[in-house]
Amino acid sequence: MKIFVTGVAGQLGHDVMNELASRGYVGVGTDLAESYSGIQDGSYVTTAEYVSLDITNKEAVMNTIKTVNPDVVVHCAAWTAVDLAEDEDKQAKVKAINVDGTQNIADACKEVDAKMVYISTDYVFDGQGTEPWQPDCKDYKPLNVYGQTKLGGELAVSNTLSKYFIVRIAWVFGKNGNNFIKTMLNVGKKFDTLRVVNDQIGTPTYTFDLARLLVDIIETDKYGYYHATNEGGYISWYDFACEIFKQAGYTTKVNPVTTEEYGLSKAARPFNSRLDKSKLVENGFKPLPTWQDALARYLKELA
């Protein structure tokens, strides 16, 4: 099986490529840079076949995917700078990448009859209430530009293809990129006390674990919508920060604050990012390990 992976310079794309190699599959990576520009850790992705591609260039996407002729495309590339996406001068570019770029990928998948995996987000929902969001819920009300464009990408995929997996994730962390854990470790070295919000609730997603699940999924034809974060219960960012410092051996004191008290963010964030993942088990997929276990392994990976 040959798999074309977009966004390999990012956290998830990096881990998907390496997971494919560990199972004997051929992964072809792509990103915007002329050559692989992610972390140089000596893993498979750093030397694998790579194609430079601007996903907003419809003709280039079609030609590249027809040439590679993959069985599956795992589409990890996206604009993910949530606050920056609110700037008026950035919004056309955000849409071009997250909506139009995804449409280009979907059109090419249809042309070569490839399965497509689209990575989406809890931000397609409005985050109201306390009940976990179901994967097949269509009550979309994104609160910010990023969420609106990721929803646009979902609709592009579902309206174009029948052989698709839309996988929503949240609170992502991985080796190859910036994330909340790295931020906490950095600021925890500089400050004795920190303020972290305690009214946004969800579950983290370790890209190493998610990559394994995604390869499990593409080995099947169990198409549709899935939610995939680590197990271990729903938590706040405050809870997460406390556990990060505990496991890392930091003495940093964390003070809980509300989102309103914290301020600073341009983009509105959902309060309820609880994602129901029971559909994974119902379809025979193994759930991700607990986020506490994932954090412990990740800290070792960073060491």
Regions found by a protein language model. Name each.
Residues 190, 213, 220-265, 271-272:
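Mid/C-terminal beta-alpha module of Rossmann-like enzyme folds, strongest
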Residues 43-57:
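Rossmann-fold cofactor-recognition segment
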Residues 155-202, 208-209:
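NAD(P)-dependent short-chain dehydrogenase/reductase
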Residues 236-242, 258-298, 302:
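Conserved C-terminal active-site "lid" loop/helix of NAD(P)H-dependent oxidoreductases
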Residues 1-23:
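N-terminal Rossmann NAD(P)H-binding glycine-rich loop of SDR-like oxidoreductase domains
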Residues 92-104, 124-167, 172:
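Catalytic helix-loop patch of NAD(P)-dependent Rossmann-fold dehydrogenases
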